[in-house]
């Protein structure tokens, strides 16, 4: 099991839909979140990509020097980046971070945003371009001299002079719910990512991807992208969830949903279909809450509950075949601590940093002794 956190380079706060309780999204805050995740034992952090975010490569490079063990899941963008340039960027980042790079392959899902970046090809053509990109990128990272001509990419005698730290290259993560996306993932990538859908839908998707990978003679790992709201009691957790969206009015929700409907991403459509913009039907599966998706693109669901309940839901996904969990929560600094301190001890997730959490003592009682801890069980 690996557990990643999230660097909120598109903004953060205590509430959605208002500047009340908002936080300045700058390097100092990103560093706080990254260093907390590093100290708490998270495997790594995801950096989002797109016009509403700070550049993920520059942000990851800045944070790598502020952390020691934390890995960085950073996006390459086929169609917006040439594979040779992306290979040099990834190789440099992997070497300078001493092998702490993970690569997120993002084909894009919003034609309006992509047009602003100069990309005008259709949904399925984007995945063809992605396959061409990865054919060249992987060859370069393996140390090959690549000559290739496809419908979207052409290179002659391209090579990489400085190899990455990880061999043959950093792991490739990929999410795509359409058939074209699944085919691209099965041919080229290492970890297939799904949004936080109900377990029965996740199970179906995993089976589909496994079959496609088998046709390619490959096996894959699987990951899931979720928010989390965990508190010491169920009541506190659900109160926190309702408080998070307490400033959202119907006009704000409608405007956000209209913007999200521009997307031609199958995954985004599946996310929107979980709630259809209706705030009265947000618990779509036990402890799986779709409130964040009322106004947020991409990951729109959260596990909500007390530590035992959240751990149980995580283990249910693990039983389906999920190995990589990518979480986030509002505000990201505080929720990183809630998840690590309350839930990590209940999971089969350990490293030298999480072991330090188990040795925490709290404050001395009466300047004389430390309280004895009690470990909950799932």
Curated annotation (Swiss-Prot):
Its EC number is 1.14.14.5. Pfam families: Bac_luciferase. GO terms for biological process: alkanesulfonate catabolic process. InterPro entries: Alkanesulphonate_mOase_FMN-dep (IPR019911), Luciferase-like_dom (IPR011251), Luciferase-like_sf (IPR036661), SsuD_RutA_monooxygenase (IPR050172). Gene3D superfamilies: Luciferase-like domain. One of its GO terms (molecular function) is alkanesulfonate monooxygenase activity. It catalyses: an alkanesulfonate + FMNH2 + O2 = an aldehyde + FMN + sulfite + H2O + 2 H(+). Coiled coil: none annotated. It comes from Bacillus velezensis (strain DSM 23117 / BGSC 10A6 / LMG 26770 / FZB42). This is Alkanesulfonate monooxygenase. Keywords: Flavoprotein, FMN, Monooxygenase, Oxidoreductase. Belongs to the SsuD family. It is an enzyme of class 1 (oxidoreductase).
